[in-house]
Structure formats: C-alpha cells, structure tokens
C-alpha cells in the first residue's frame, strides 16, 4: 500500500513538472503580425512560426527593434500557399525543416548573411524550381532539398568557399562530391 501511494506521488509530481515546462515554452512564444517568434539569449529574434495565408511573404528585418537572425525549426511547415518568401540579410541560420512541405514555393534566394541551412530545410517543396546559395553559407544539412520534385537549378555564388554548382547540381567546393542532385534535372550524368 505504501509503495502504491509513493508511486502515485511520483506520478503526480511528474505530471506537474511537465505542465510547468509546457507552460513556460508556450509563454515564450510571442506574435508580430502573422509571425510567431522568440527572443534569443543574445537579444536577437528567431521566427518560430507563421500563421498567415499570403502567397508572398516578407520576413521583417527587425521585430520590436531586435534583429531577426534565425528561421527556426519547422517555422513555415505546411505553409502551402506561399509562392515566394523574402528574408532579410540579418538572417544567419535556417533551421531544420524550416520550410517543410511549402508545396507552392517556386524559388528561394538565400540571404547573404546565412551561414547554415539545416537538415531538410526545404524538403517536400514540390513547386521549388531554383535556389541561389550565397558566399557565406558554410554548412548545408543533409536532405536540405529532398523530394523537391521540380527543382532543376541550385546556383552557388562564385565566392563561396565550401560549395559550388555546375549544370544546376550542388557540389562541394572542388566538385569531388555531389551534395544535391536536383530531382527535376533530366538527362545530365556524372561519373
């Protein structure tokens, strides 16, 4: 009987602890128009969600006078109406699956400030046709452009020290390794 009461007390404590954590996470999300965001430890902003239905989306450079530096994990997940998105140069990080299943997104120009593109950042973007990757990108996560059925062109600027492109295909800098062979490219072969 004592063991049963002890187990019930532990279970009750665990439920309360989980509820407190969930409330703390929910309390951290703020809204700015259709954007959900959080303020990071360094005082900059991470976009954590989007609730709009616009086709063309402009991510603000600042929210409440704080620079937007990150597009968070899953931030635009399933935003199927977006056809184009503009991000400010202040963005340095695009998170894991940030644009997952944005099926109407046609093209994306990664801002010059971006250093890292997370795992599967643009996965399942069936409408995506082209991507431009700037000089400052040092890391592109695995599967960043997986299942983008119409993707035919990944362009890397000449000044990028880590990546290059040829015929729309994404390579490491010295072209010894294919990083991403776009699904929409037909009749091009590499050996």
What are the language-model segments listed below?
Residues 34-43, 52-70, 80-93, 102-116, ...:
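Structural signature of tandem-repeat unit edges
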Residues 20-33:
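Sec-dependent signal peptide cleavage junction
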Residues 9, 74, 177-179:
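Glycine-rich loops and low-complexity Gly/Arg-rich segments
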Residues 1-6:
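N-terminal secretory signal peptides that target proteins for export/translocation
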Residues 11-23:
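Bacterial N-terminal signal peptides
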């Amino acid at each position: 009987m004592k063991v049963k009461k002890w187990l019930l007390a532990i279970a009750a404590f665990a439920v309360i602890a989980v509820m407190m954590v969930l409330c703390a996470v929910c309390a951290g999300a703020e809204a700015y128009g259709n954007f959900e965001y959080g303020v990071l430890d360094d005082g900059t902003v991470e976009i954590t969600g989007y609730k709009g239905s616009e086709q063309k989306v402009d991510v603000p450079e600042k929210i409440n006078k704080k620079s937007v530096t990150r597009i968070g994990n899953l931030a635009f997940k399933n935003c199927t109406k977006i056809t184009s998105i503009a991000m400010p140069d202040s963005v340095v990080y695009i998170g894991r699956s940030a644009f997952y299943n944005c099926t109407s997104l046609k093209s994306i120009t990664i801002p010059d400030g971006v250093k890292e593109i997370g795992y599967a950042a643009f996965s399942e973007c069936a409408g995506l046709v082209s991507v431009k990757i700037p000089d400052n990108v040092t890391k592109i996560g695995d599967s960043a452009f997986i299942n983008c059925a119409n993707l035919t062109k990944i362009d890397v600027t000449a000044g990028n020290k880590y990546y290059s492109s040829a015929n729309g295909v994404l390579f490491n800098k010295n072209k010894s390794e294919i990083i991403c062979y776009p699904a929409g490219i037909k009749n091009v072969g590499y050996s």
